Amino acid sequence: MRYLTIALSKGRLTDMSVEIFEKIGIDCTELKSSTRKLILSDEKNKIKFFLAKPADVPTYVEYGAADIGIVGKDTLLEEGRNLYEVLDLGFAACRMALAGPAELQGKIDELNIKRVGTKYPNITRNYFEKTRRESVEIIKLNGSVELAPLVGLSEVIVDLVESGRTLKENGLVVLDTIADISARMVVNRVSMKMENERIQKIIDGVRDELSVRG
């Protein structure tokens, strides 16, 4: 029996994923250790894990380097990879939003937006072209996106919003919700066919655990 490989997003999704996997009988001892090993395993269940940057997880899954991945919906929307999205895990919930200065609230249809600051150029382009049918200049940023409208780099931003506290503290508000975001389980298309029974068992186990949690 070959190993199933699971790619986990580095960061807070790792701990949440480990908690669920342990509940369904997967041994995550190595994964929780301080080892420097890049590939970690559960020998009993023939499962291997590795941690990757969130943006890379869909790539590993699409190309079959991982059979299963745990990643945020924001990354899936931005990367647009060809894979199966099989479960909404519900945790790490937030929303992708269009945000800007408070004085623009309620005036979204009147806005003449020319520039948008964001870490998510593909999501932003799709939103403006398909939903708003507008052409804008998208400025790719890597740091604090909220800074862009404050210094005149852009009129508005597209970013993840959780509590909205950072926006509020900087005089910004949500102007429109683009998508609801949470952690998702994804599966390689070929693996889903070739290892269907084993993968489906994991999917069903996680789904049952999530339903118990409500």
Curated annotation (Swiss-Prot):
Coiled coil: none annotated. Its EC number is 2.4.2.17. It is found in: Cytoplasm. PROSITE patterns: ATP_P_PHORIBOSYLTR. It is an enzyme of class 2 (transferase). One of its GO terms (biological process) is L-histidine biosynthetic process. Belongs to the ATP phosphoribosyltransferase family. Short subfamily. Heteromultimer composed of HisG and HisZ subunits. This is ATP phosphoribosyltransferase. It comes from Ruminiclostridium cellulolyticum (strain ATCC 35319 / DSM 5812 / JCM 6584 / H10) (Clostridium cellulolyticum). The gene is hisG.
